[in-house]
Amino acid sequence: MVMVTQKIYIELKAFDSYLLDRSARSIILTAKRSGARVNGPIFFPRRVAKFIVNRSTHVDKKSREQFEIRTHKRLISLPKANSTIIQALMSLQLPAGVDVKVKVIGGSNG
């Protein structure tokens, strides 16, 4: 039987770093239980978007409010993933605050 191996990149984004790390840990444990070799999690720089608005509606320019959104990002790489690993990852339940993007590369036989 010929097994098709693929390279998989799993990119995780979240506003809460605790949720993100917990999700990355569960993905890594699931992949290792299925027999995959795992690279990561690779930490990306935190992105901070700042919004500054006036407190008053008309005057008093010196009185302002600052808000920020911090976006945390991680990357997990599975260099040689087969169908059993993909099925195990598909059945994984992740929290609602985590954005998951999966990129599958290749399909070399062997």
Swiss-Prot record:
How does the annotation summarize its subunit structure? Answer: Part of the 30S ribosomal subunit.
Q: What's in the GO CC field?
A: ribonucleoprotein complex; ribosome
Q: Per UniProt, what is one GO molecular function of this protein? A: structural constituent of ribosome
Q: What job does this protein perform?
A: Involved in the binding of tRNA to the ribosomes.
Q: Record's family?
A: Belongs to the universal ribosomal protein uS10 family.
> What is the name of this protein?
Small ribosomal subunit protein uS10
Task: Note the superkingdom of the native organism.
Answer: Bacteria
